[in-house]
Amino acid sequence: MKAFIAAAAMSLMLGAPVQAEEKRGEKMVPLSPTVLSAEDVQSVAPALVRFGSEVLIDDLWQRSELLRRDRSIVTVAILIARNQPAELKQYVDVALDNAVTPVEISEIITHLAFYSGWPNAMAAVAVTKDIFAARGIRREQLASASPELLALNQAAENQRSSTVEHNFGAISPGLVKFTAQPLFLDLWQRPGLKPRDRSLVTVSALIAAGQSAQIGYHLNRAMDNGLTAQEAGEIVAHAAFYAGWPNAFSAVAVVGEVLRARGLEG
């Protein structure tokens, strides 16, 4: 039932993706849903049709606190993290219509192989390859497997690596090794996602997985790279619908701690 509700709400929502050039606050252009029709949902849960229209379409996705491009990134990340490939198909299409590039979609999947697991990433690949094929997106349009990496913030990396080594080096040397290379010295330095967006993906996936203990570090990193306090709060509001209210409330407590520490709350 839980999976059905998620799919139903998603299909209603996806009756209204938008074009990239639309301004925030404009009503979405309706499209026919491709997973569940409104009639299918009416036959089982009529209230979901109302909530899907009044709340998801006409309210949540219209809110100006977060760009639709960013909402699309958050949603795609959550669906990959929760391994929901049926819903992901529609939201990858919506993301591409909302100015998320094929390179960015590719990098989101690659990034989440590390944060949500290889099987989840492979499930996302299986869905996305058909979308790319239908849109004529070719391999040569995607980022290189081994691109020139972004410049490393050596001071921040030194602090991260020393903390990890001190806390976990004697327990799991392998984890410490792989956290440095490839995670932070390769994956995080890939240019296919801007640092702010890579952190946005990570925070969204952590919320979806209920991993609130890890959110603070990555939210601080996102805000160091340009994410605003308003956007941070809105990510949690958006995630409530796609990852569930309990996960959102677990996350909002951590977000509040980060904002207070930065003098940004209120």
What residues fall within each predicted segment?
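Sec-dependent signal peptide recognition
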Residues: 1-7
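Bacterial N-terminal signal peptides
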Residues: 7-15
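Sec/Tat signal peptide C-region and signal peptidase I cleavage site
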Residues: 16-20
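Acidic, glycine/proline-rich low-complexity segments that act as flexible tails and inter-domain linkers
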Residues: 21-69, 82, 86-93, 97, ...
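Short, structured motif recognition centered on aromatic/hydrophobic residues
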Residues: 71-79, 108-109, 198-206, 235-239
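A short structural micro-motif
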Residues: 80, 98, 111-118, 207, ...
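Preference for long, well-ordered alpha-helical segments
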Residues: 120-121, 211, 231-250
